[in-house]
């Protein structure tokens, strides 16, 4: 096996892992966003416990759905990953300091979003050259 072939295999593997994570994150965040907007107890309870009212619940649901949509778009998936990582960073802090419960689910989603950001980092240069 030559070096270019090994590099191509790694790139294809990285690409496949990124797509799998993106599909998982899009599915999870779309379901969470719909659940939060529809006030399904499993999804909306922790948002309601923050105590900021319905406007905050709507904002969280919209943030989750936007993130799910953007991470699904091939050319700008890295922006969706950064968006979701930021949201999950705040979710971890909220679970630790306001709700005082386990942030494990939010932390796992944060790590998955960061991993997609790392795997799709080449999109930053493409976006910069295209829009700046």
Language-model-detected regions and their locations in the chain:
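Hydrophobic alpha-helical context, especially transmembrane and signal-peptide helices
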Residues: 17, 24, 42, 52, ...
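Short juxtamembrane and helix-loop transition motifs at transmembrane-helix boundaries
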Residues: 37-48, 63-75
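Solvent-exposed, flexible loop/coil residues
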Residues: 41, 56, 60, 108, ...
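Core segments of alpha-helical transmembrane spans in multipass integral membrane proteins
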Residues: 31, 52-72, 86
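N-terminal hydrophobic or amphipathic segments with adjacent small-residue motifs
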Residues: 20, 27, 45, 55, ...
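Solvent-exposed, well-ordered loop and adjacent helix/strand elements within mature globular domains
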Residues: 27-56
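Extended, low-polarity transmembrane helix blocks
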Residues: 1-31, 73-132
């Amino acid at each position: 096996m030559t070096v270019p072939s090994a590099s191509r295999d790694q790139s294809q593997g990285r690409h496949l892992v990124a797509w799998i994570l993106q599909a998982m994150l899009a599915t999870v965040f779309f379901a969470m966003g719909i659940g939060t907007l529809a006030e399904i107890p499993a999804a909306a309870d922790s948002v309601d416990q923050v105590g900021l009212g319905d406007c905050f619940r709507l904002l969280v649901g919209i943030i989750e759905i936007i993130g799910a949509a953007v991470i699904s778009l091939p050319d700008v998936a890295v922006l969706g990953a950064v968006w979701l990582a930021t949201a999950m960073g705040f979710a971890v802090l909220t679970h630790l300091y306001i709700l005082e419960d386990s942030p494990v689910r939010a932390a796992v989603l944060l790590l998955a979003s960061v991993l997609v950001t790392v795997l799709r980092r080449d999109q930053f240069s493409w976006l910069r050259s295209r829009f700046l």
